[in-house]
Amino acid sequence: MKDQRLIYADPCDLDTLRQALKDADPDNRLCPILMDRIYIQKEAIELLPEIIKEHSKGKKVLMVTDMTPYFRGKDSLKEQIYFLLNQEYEVSWLVLDNHDHVLHAVDEESVKIQEAIKAFGADCVVGIGGGTVTDLCKDATHAVDDNMP
């Protein structure tokens, strides 16, 4: 029988999710969930400056996106985030190329992010987009500095 905690999991309730995964994986084959919070709510982007402040003392933020447009109404969500972050931080925006309209998680893309982190002297990386952008940012920050948020 499948664990109901996993079928109907609230992704914001990380403690319950961690315990359900631990119970379902006695051999510890799955990677642990290391994030401390997940925000799924209206106006979540407005929380970004405060979240960054909690995790980084620095003022240099590398914002990484792909070329896929996201909108809130008629406004570009990525541009809104960039503007919002620029009010409190020095922001460099790296746009990854969607080869053939699809971004792939390949070493080449991770290296681009790593190079941007080093060249800009980023204190924090914010990935905006889907799972591929997020995975690439995690891989790149891990390669540069395990403690970089």
Task: List each language-model region with its residue ranges.
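Glycine/threonine-rich beta-strand-loop-alpha-helix active-site module
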Residues: A105-P149
